[in-house]
């Protein structure tokens, strides 16, 4: 029985009990007190208990409806009228009890500047909160990257609910929006220490190398934060705190969350939907050197862009070699073939979680021909709905993140930060289906099919068989000692925070 049916059932039960008590027992009690003033006390108690129990049942039903939701999907037995009614009820504000503050001797202040796109910064924030907690320092709300390719001026408070971030983690670490005035003045005068921590470090590095610097300088600024904490070899409580920050401490702003709910509601009204993280934007192709399917003019444009950014060290890139090694995102044409081979219903809604696709409609034609119900946030919402986050790529990515979490199927066409962080979050939400495409395997198979070396039936059955174990089901991370870039990423499979089979880590 779904929650709405329980609610209606308990409500009828409550009304029936109230009616019986109001019209029958109350009247009898009244007469009884007149005619028999020495009525047995147990009868009064019995009636009182019955009345209280009826009220309790009713309140329990309401409690199920009004309990906090973490952007959950609606029960399948809701109709549209019940859906809108329940949505109104769950929008009522609830008072949340804050955890008690953790009391500790403060060793200093940690400032961090995150680098990269939204999800690279998201993982870095989780790491830096964890590091701050185990060094017993005060963390200043992280600064987000404003100088990278995306040139997004968004502050932390423009993307994340900063008050929730501070209060929800206060039983672990003290977080401030800014330094105390005296120390802030010192920083403005340049009297502080700044450095990038070493990548893939364990907790002993932070205890033995970083903490002494915090104590010495009082304020330490870590100016790079990507992958600065190891995937493996950390205490379980450290890993669980990383999860807690990711899944509970980091909430998007109410404005972004509300827009995400609206997009999901629009999609759900038309049935199931698949979110496709089609990472085929200009920056990805330029910096990766992947130009398969592009015309000569486009290849030249991508090369010019790569050379225009001096911080990008790799300039000369063999596109076809990278593609065959599985290091390029799938093209829209390759994606259409792959989804069809996997047996995805051509009528399913496909939500594109990405920026502007390079090559526009010309490159998207194969995908939209194969799957006519391709949509984007720009086509589902009014233009004015997106005004607040227009030209703010991280806020747009936050909206896509929310929709990706709620999708029936999530399919990324590369293994970048969004693909991996969303995959891990979907595992946490109950191992929701995420198809992890093996690009190296697929491009070889696609080339054989397009060259006429494979029939469609063989191509399709091979793709299905290979990916049958790559659907986001429970598994252990692959550990490769001293090669952290090649092993499974912690945030893609935070197994310490999940219900898994009792299996050891896979080590090669």
Swiss-Prot record:
What Enzyme Commission number(s) appear in the record?
2.4.1.351
The GO molecular function terms of this record are: UDP-glycosyltransferase activity
User: Do you know which InterPro entries this protein is assigned to?
Assistant: FucosylTrfase_pln (IPR024709), GDP-Fuc_O-FucTrfase (IPR019378)
Binding annotation for substrate: 277-279
Residues the record marks as carrying a glycan: 136, 202, 223, 391
Q: How is this protein's function tied to pH?
A: Optimum pH is 7.0.
Membrane-related topology note: Single-pass type II membrane protein
The record's catalysed reaction(s) read: alpha-D-galacturonosyl-[(1->2)-alpha-L-rhamnosyl-(1->4)-alpha-D-galacturonosyl](n) + UDP-beta-L-rhamnose = [(1->2)-alpha-L-rhamnosyl-(1->4)-alpha-D-galacturonosyl](n+1) + UDP + H(+)
Question: Per the record, a Pfam family?
Answer: O-FucT
Instruction: List the GO terms this entry assigns under cellular component, sorted alphabetically.
Output: Golgi membrane
Gene disruption: observed consequences: Reduced volume of the seed coat mucilage due to reduced levels of rhamnogalacturonan I (RG-I) in the seed coat mucilage.
Q: What is the stated purpose of this protein? A: Glycosyltransferase involved in the formation of rhamnogalacturonan I (RG-I) oligosaccharides in the seed coat mucilage, which is a specialized cell wall with abundant RG-I. Transfers the rhamnose residue from UDP-beta-L-rhamnose to RG-I oligosaccharides. Prefers RG-I oligosaccharides with a degree of polymerization of 5 or larger than 5. Does not act on oligosaccharides with a degree of polymerization of 4 or smaller than 4. Does not require metal ions for its activity.
> Could you say which protein family the record assigns here?
Belongs to the glycosyltransferase GT106 family.
Protein name in the entry: Rhamnogalacturonan I rhamnosyltransferase 1
Organism, per UniProt? Arabidopsis thaliana
């Amino acid at each position: 029985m779904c929650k709405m049916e329980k609610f209606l059932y308990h409500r009828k039960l409550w009304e029936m009990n109230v009616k019986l008590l109001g019209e029958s027992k109350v009247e009898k009690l009244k007469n009884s007190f007149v005619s028999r003033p020495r009525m047995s006390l147990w009868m009064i108690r019995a009636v009182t208990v019955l009345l209280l129990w009826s009220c309790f049942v009713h309140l329990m039903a309401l409690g199920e409806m009004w309990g906090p939701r973490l952007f959950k999907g609606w029960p399948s037995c809701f109709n549209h009228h019940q859906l809108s009614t329940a949505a109104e009820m769950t929008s009522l504000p609830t008072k949340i009890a804050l955890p008690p503050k953790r009391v500790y001797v403060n060793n200093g202040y940690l400032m961090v500047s995150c680098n990269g796109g939204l999800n690279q910064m998201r993982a870095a924030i989780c790491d830096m909160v964890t590091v701050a907690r185990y060094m017993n320092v005060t963390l200043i709300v992280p600064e987000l990257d404003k100088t990278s390719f995306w040139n997004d001026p968004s502050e932390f408070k423009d993307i994340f609910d900063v008050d929730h971030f501070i209060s929800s983690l206060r039983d672990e670490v003290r977080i401030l929006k800014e330094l105390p005035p005296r120390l802030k003045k010192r920083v403005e005068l340049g009297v502080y220490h700044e450095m990038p921590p070493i990548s893939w470090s364990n907790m002993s590095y932070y205890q033995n190398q970083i903490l002494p610097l915090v104590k010495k300088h009082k304020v330490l600024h870590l100016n790079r934060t990507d992958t600065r904490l190891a995937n493996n070899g950390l205490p379980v409580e450290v890993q669980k705190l990383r999860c807690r920050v990711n899944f509970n401490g980091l909430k998007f702003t109410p404005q972004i969350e509300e827009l995400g709910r609206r997009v999901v509601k629009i999609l759900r009204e038309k049935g199931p939907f698949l979110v496709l993280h089609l990472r085929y934007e200009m920056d990805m192709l330029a910096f990766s050197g992947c130009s398969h399917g592009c015309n000569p003019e486009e290849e030249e444009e991508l090369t010019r862009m790569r050379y225009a950014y001096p911080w990008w060290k790799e300039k000369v890139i063999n596109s076809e070699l990278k593609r065959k090694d599985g290091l390029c995102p799938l093209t829209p044409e390759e994606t259409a073939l792959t989804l069809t081979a996997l047996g995805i219903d051509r009528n399913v809604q496909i939500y594109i979680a990405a920026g502007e696709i390079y090559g526009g409609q010309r490159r998207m034609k194969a995908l939209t021909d194969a799957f006519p119900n391709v949509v984007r946030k720009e086509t589902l919402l009014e233009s004015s709905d997106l005004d607040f986050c227009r030209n703010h790529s991280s806020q747009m990515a936050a909206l896509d993140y929310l929709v990706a979490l709620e999708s029936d199927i999530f399919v990324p066409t590369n293994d970048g930060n969004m693909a991996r962080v969303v995959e891990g979050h979907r595992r946490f939400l109950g191992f929701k289906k995420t198809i992890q495409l093996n690009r190296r395997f697929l491009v070889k198979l696609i080339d054989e099919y397009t060259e006429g070396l494979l029939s469609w039936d063989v191509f399709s059955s091979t793709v299905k068989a290979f990916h049958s174990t790559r659907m986001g089901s429970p598994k252990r991370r692959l550990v490769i000692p001293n090669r952290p870039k090649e092993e499974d990423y912690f945030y893609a499979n935070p197994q310490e925070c999940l219900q898994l089979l009792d299996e050891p880590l896979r080590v090669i």
